[in-house]
Amino acid sequence: MGEILLKNISVNGNECDMLIEDGRISRIADAGTIAYDGADVVECRGKVAMPGFVNMHTHAGMAMMRGIGEDIAFHQWLDRIWEIEKNLDEEYVYHATKVACLEMIKTGTTAFNDQYWYMPMAYKAVSEMGLRALLSYVVCDRNDPEESERQKVQCQEMYEASKSWSDMVTFVISIHAIYSVSESMILWASDFARKNGLKIHVHLSETEKEVSDCMAQHGGMSPVEYLDSLGVLGEDVIAAHTLWLSDKDVEILGKRGVTCVHNVNSNLKLASGYKFKYNELRDAGANVCLGTDGCASSNNLDMLETMKTSAMIQKAWRNDTSAMPINELIEMVTVNPAKVLGINVGRIEEGALADLLLIDVGSYHFMSPGSFEANLIYSAHSDCVDSVICNGRFLMKNRVVPGEKEILAEAKKYLHRIM
């Protein structure tokens, strides 16, 4: 792995030199004070270094499904997606995942938590693109006993195969949702995850209907109460959406230390709701992060857009301009996900893994004495991301991702699978 020397880069408001060696930030010092023979020396004047974003809930294989389920109710949308997915194969998922990775790189994401099918091909795509990822084996038996048994065997086979994966990618168990997975399969999946030290990823309390149906079927228990009664919830659980919550639900999620992922654009677009209980979850002890959801529901994977919309909706529905402040927004896409990843990312400091962005502050979006973070979130767009480094390697330099045109051209050949 080659060394990189970033000259005259702004770090926390100071002009510095930064040396990257063996995938880590090895030294940060005053500008002009680091010399290193053989390093790739990059002049960074006019650019700011910040941690790469982590997208904590998405479906990368949906990257070519934008615009196919518009203006219909959530459960109609879900039925349409499931019908389309019957025609997909591993080659489609491979190319769609590469498209998703390309978009994430272009918009500043260096790691993501994915839930989709054909895991081996997703792994191939992610490895080729150079991002970090949590990739899920998705349990979704739809109460079919034969399908349950098939998935158990396949899950165990794929987990064994994953032991040869790069340490950039982590195997995760996904329980699709309580309405699509039988109780016996939920118990099996959570037990398998715990026996093997794996994270559990689940859609939870996404819609009002999910909650009312659960209460009708499970003696008045909410989805959160139901999963808790089964012993599923814990610090190893990543719960996507957690939108329709009672005070008791919030208390349980906080007490169990669950990671709750807010997917604002998907929730808004599918009219799932908007009153995400950020303050309450944070104060209860939950680890709150942000995600985009898949492109079939949110239509892009832009974490800057996600941050801006999340904050503005919080401020509006709470009638509180201080809701979801800037520093906490940044933490929700950097430091908080790092707790789940269990690695030293999310900060620009010596010894940290070199997953970082170089932000070009030369545009009118940053022509202000206001804070860099405020201008980044509320004024700029993702095209301000000039370069992306992940694990000490440039994935994008000066807005160019190697092979980008070829990735799109190859993927285009597979669009007919969803038409």
What are these regions (language model features)?
Residues 66-131, 153-165, 412-418:
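Alpha-helical scaffold segments that flank or form the walls of functional sites
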Residues 229-233, 278-363, 377-380:
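His/Asp/Glu-enriched, well-ordered alpha-helical/loop segment
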Residues 64-95, 102, 129-144, 149, ...:
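Active-site gating loops and adjacent loop-to-helix segments of metal-dependent hydrolytic enzymes
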Residues 122-243:
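Metal-coordinating catalytic core of metallo-dependent amide/deamination hydrolases
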Residues 1-16, 20-26, 333-419:
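Active-site microenvironment of metallo-dependent hydrolases
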Residues 208-221, 249-254, 271-281, 298-315:
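Histidine/acidic-residue-rich catalytic or RNA/ligand-binding cores of hydrolases
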Residues 9, 23, 46, 57, ...:
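Divalent metal-coordination and catalytic microenvironments
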